[in-house]
Amino acid sequence: MATLFDPIVLGDLELPNRIVMAPLTRCRADEGSVPNALMAEYYAQRADAGLILSEATAVTPMGVGYPDTPGIWSDDQVRGWSNVTKAVHAAGGRIFLQLWHVGRISDPLYLNGELPVAPSAIAAEGHVSLVRPKRPYVTPRALDTEEIADIVEAYRQGAERAKAAGFDGVEIHGANGYLLDQFLQDSTNKRTDRYGGSIENRARLLLEVTDAAISVWGAQRVGVHLAPRADSHDMGDSNRLETFSHVTRELGKRGIAFICAREAQADDSIGVALKKAFGGPYIANEKFTLDSANAILAKGDADAVAFGVPFIANPDLVERLRQGAELNPPRPETFYTGGTEGYLDYPTLA
């Protein structure tokens, strides 16, 4: 019976424990979406995690939807990330870069006046993140079929640059209502070309992007992030089980290192079915505690557990969980504010 503190092999990478740091947007990058010394220190502080999944990182300027988030399309960004990976490795850690395109969850403010792109011209309900006064999401521009190859190539180049920056692998962000998720789910994908309609067509872009990353890294250093809950950024699918089972089966055929799924503890969870369909290491990610994390591992419904907010407030989360120690409370008002406050100043155990 596995516990959080047992080692695990993901792909060809052996982890000392099953505690994964989930991707966490923190809005601390420098001008030009360049990672900086603050970020290197932040990630190094958390290197005891079995695996760090970096904050979501845009593969193209048109994939940005939040202020001061990092990218992986320029040489300066590669140099900035290189300092991060060196710091994590010096502290004994392992880190994958999460490759990201927000699709319609953006605004011309972030895109040099351009409209966001999406599978279909359907605006998301809600308001643009971290913009005041609040403004609703605009109606995005539907991508032409011929443009989609450029999206795949941007991910492939992002994977190459991640390797140049010293990462241990990459995770494809296919979750939370961003571009690849928008193609996958039928509420946001109304296309009539080979990227829309059937489940096979709607999953095509995610799988092409995965194959592009595999061409750079090999399958054993590629993971995929999914959100079968389908509840972020005005998403929805008419048959979640059928859609996500197809995707996980296809990813399983490719032999990727893992799936990390933000869907694990609700009564209507389909995580067990998806884990079976995938057949490989399955990381659960949804507001876990020490007890609930060990419980899902003991049941065999997940192979590792990703923690998000607890890692923000507890750089030594692994040791705190090991000791059953009290956790620092998070300070949400500092999650996206820049600077060291609420970023580098959480206390560790004495």
Segments from the language model and where they lie:
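Flavin-dependent oxidoreductase catalytic cores
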Residues: 1-350
